[in-house]
């Protein structure tokens, strides 16, 4: 079993901790919570770079080793880092539980050292018809991010 963790932060009030667990070659389970969000849906993605030198903007595009268009987590055509949306309640807290086979913690496409980004707006899952739908899901600004690291 391989475990990883990311502590999310920003210059805003948004913060959280996300845990990743992968058993063997199986899917990766993602759990945790994010607080300080406005109520509603927020895009939740793995971005390509583990670089926060310019805040969340320097984390690059969505992690996309296969060179596909943006989509929903259940779509065949999607970025590996497309994990859809998280839903914040009236208290501003989003509880996260995702199981995904495209975000391994080991091997050539490992997400270790990459970034988790929570966005200001809903991800339209590539189906919104906006010019950004097929690249970012038109999910708006980056309100929190952190770098995924191995955990003992």
UniProtKB/Swiss-Prot annotation:
InterPro entries: SOD-like_Cu/Zn_dom_sf, SOD_Cu/Zn_/chaperone, SOD_Cu/Zn_BS, SOD_Cu_Zn_dom
Gene3D superfamilies per record: Superoxide dismutase, copper/zinc binding domain
Sorted UniProt keywords: Antioxidant, Copper, Cytoplasm, Disulfide bond, Metal-binding, Oxidoreductase, Zinc
GO MF annotation terms: copper ion binding; superoxide dismutase activity
Catalytic activity: 2 superoxide + 2 H(+) = H2O2 + O2
GO cellular component assignments: cytoplasm
Places the protein is found: Cytoplasm
Positions bound to Cu cation: 45, 47, 62, 119
Gene Ontology terms describing biological process: removal of superoxide radicals
Binding positions (Zn(2+)): 62, 70, 79, 82
EC number: 1.15.1.1
Pfam families found in the cross-reference section: Sod_Cu (PF00080)
Cofactor binding note from Swiss-Prot or TrEMBL: Binds 1 copper ion per subunit.
Function: Destroys radicals which are normally produced within the cells and which are toxic to biological systems.
Family listed: Belongs to the Cu-Zn superoxide dismutase family.
Protein name as annotated: Superoxide dismutase [Cu-Zn] 1
The organism's taxonomic lineage, starting at the top: Eukaryota, Viridiplantae, Streptophyta, Embryophyta, Tracheophyta
Gene: SODCC1
